[in-house]
A protein has these predicted regions:
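Terminal RNA-binding accessory module
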Residues: 1-71, 339-342, 350
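Short, acidic/hydrophobic/Gly-rich beta-strand patch recurrent on exposed beta strands
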Residues: 17-22, 137-142, 328
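Phospho-regulated, low-complexity intrinsically disordered regions of nuclear gene-regulatory
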Residues: 461, 509-531
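DNA-recognition alpha helix
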Residues: 463-475, 485-491
């Protein structure tokens, strides 16, 4: 046994502590926090790094707390229940910042504060509980060893009740050895769909349970059986058969209606997904209705495409997976957006040049690629197309930074990055980036002072968009640029001449309502523009 004292100086991709071992190698220590001094047992060694286990915390961080889950440290579902939630948001922002500087090569990129959950527990609408040798629970971190569960703080209450029901029932089931997983979906209305997965044709045995299930789980509206393929890649890899109730689960997202089957892809945290989509639309310049034409280069089943179509004149979604395009077209029909959203089956890298050649133009493009990032050919196609605004949605900071670097080399500027916490208590972070095309024919680098711009020190501290975003996040309503300008003038913050004023001498200018004035004043104080 090798025990060392380690000073933790950073965090890894799963929010594990990172420090230096005695020989200088990086050591990853789950459960340790930046700034802490911990006694660590080295449990795994590699040529360039090692992994350790906390034996004792010698100097604790102020952000440390007692984990609130009895399975934490054994179950692999959470990485960060030993720290305050606010600390996880700071570390996720830092992870995005570090990726953009170290991998993207940027100097002081604008990375906003992470948008966290109002309530970080019970956020997920889908659960996959593995069943192994007749017992149900979750997999241990990094293995397929089962950890029995009676609760999961990530999941909604109906899913937990289903978990407990099967935990009690499994010992008496003759088919228990063939069952492999229980998958639950719970919509915003609290209704639940159950899918029982097995490696043998035991659907008739599950059908016998329906009267008890319906009696004991009042939220239940749909039950499916899934016979898994011989070597399944995931729990739902197989053929579904409907046993009882509704064939689809109704759900809403961004004022859109969707019907979900057991195998449908859908965001697992709809509240945060809406905030993510709002950021993506903001980056695409779609904060309100416009005549913009937008491209969605990885449209999937069309959730972001249709959210954009609510505000843009026309959106074209491109996706290479045939079932996803079929679902996207049906979702557009269901929401009455078929006339504003068109979907193309194909590789976006090949389809973009075709669209441009046929006279199509785009004011903005939205990219939401898989974890591996965007295809190089797609990025090159976007660069050649010269689309002025890119809204890049990423689930991996490293591949995001790599792609941003390529886009910058192609003439784009990174304006800002907005981390969003879609998966509380884990190391995962979603990020939205706004990249704008720099027309080199019309731009040169110059150095000017605030005096030359007639810009006051107070005015320079926050942009109108930052003030708008602050008010929307804190108060839940939007404020116009005109109202902000009125309140800034009222506070003595000098605006540039005629800024935001009508050119008509007799124009009637709407006055900022009291509640919006109070919100704007709060924002000005937050940004230290007024005392």
């Amino acid at each position: 046994m090798t025990i060392q004292q380690i000073r933790i100086t950073g965090t890894g991709s799963e929010l594990q502590g990172v420090g230096r071992a005695d020989d200088g190698r990086a050591v990853f220590v789950p459960g340790a926090l930046p700034g802490e001094c911990v006694e660590v047992e080295i449990i795994r060694q590699a040529p360039r790094f090692c992994e350790g286990r906390v034996v004792r915390v010698l100097e604790a961080s102020d952000a440390r707390r007692e984990p609130d889950c009895p399975c934490y440290g054994r179950c692999g579902g959470c990485h960060a229940r030993h720290m305050q939630y606010a600390e996880t948001l700071k570390l996720k922002r830092q992870r995005v910042y570090d990726a953009l500087t170290r991998i993207g090569g940027l100097t002081e990129p604008v990375v906003r504060e992470t948008l966290g959950c109002a309530q970080p527990d019970r956020t997920r609408n889908k659960a996959e509980f593995p069943i192994v040798h007749g017992k149900i629970g979750a997999y241990a971190a990094g293995s397929h060893a089962l950890v029995p569960l009676e609760d999961c703080l990530l999941q909604r209450e109906p899913a937990v009740r289903a978990l407990r029901w099967f935990a009690k029932k499994l010992p008496s089931l003759s088919c228990a050895s063939h069952l492999t997983a229980l998958v639950t979906r719970v919509n915003r209305a609290g209704e639940m769909m159950l899918t029982v997965c097995a490696d043998a044709p035991v659907a008739s045995e599950i059908e016998k349970l329906l009267p008890e299930l319906r009696r004991d789980l009042p939220e239940l509206v749909s039950v499916y059986f899934l016979r898994q393929n011989r070597r399944p890649s995931h729990a739902l890899d197989g053929a579904c058969s409907h046993l009882w109730g509704a064939k689809a689960l109704d759900e809403t997202l961004h004022h859109l209606k969707f019907e979900l089957s057991p195998q449908s892809f859908f965001q697992v945290n709809p509240d945060q997904a809406e905030r993510l989509y709002d950021c993506a639309l903001e980056a695409a310049g779609l904060t309100e209705s416009s005549d913009a034409r937008v491209l969605d280069a990885y449209c999937g089943v069309g959730t972001i495409t249709l959210a954009a179509a609510q505000r843009a004149a026309h959106v074209i979604g491109v996706e290479i997976v045939p079932p996803a395009i079929a679902d996207a077209r049906e979702n557009a029909r269901r929401n009455g957006l078929s006339n504003r959203a068109r979907f193309i089956l194909g590789d976006a890298a090949a389809e973009i040049p075709k669209l441009i050649a046929h006279g199509e133009h785009f004011d903005a493009a939205i990219l939401d690629p898989p974890r591996k990032g965007a295809d190089e050919k797609l990025l090159d196609a976007l660069i050649r197309a010269g689309i002025p605004t890119l809204s890049y949605v990423s689930c991996d900071p490293a591949t995001l930074a790599r792609d941003v670097k390529r886009l910058i080399a192609g003439g784009y500027l990174l304006q800002w990055a907005q981390p969003v916490d879609m998966f509380p208590w884990t190391g995962h972070v979603e990020t939205v980036c706004l990249l704008s095309k720099l027309n080199v024919k019309h731009h040169i680098e110059v150095e000017i002072t605030m005096d030359e711009l007639d810009l006051t020190a107070a005015e320079s501290k926050a942009t109108y968009d930052e003030i708008k975003a602050y008010v929307l996040e804190k108060f839940g309503f939007k404020v116009s640029q005109l109202y902000i300008a009125q309140i800034k003038r009222k506070c003595g913050i000098i605006e540039r001449k005629n800024y935001n004023q009508s050119k008509k001498e007799d124009a009637k200018v709407p006055k900022c309502p009291p509640e919006k004035e109070a919100a704007i004043m709060d924002a000005l104080k937050h940004f230290q523009m007024i005392p």
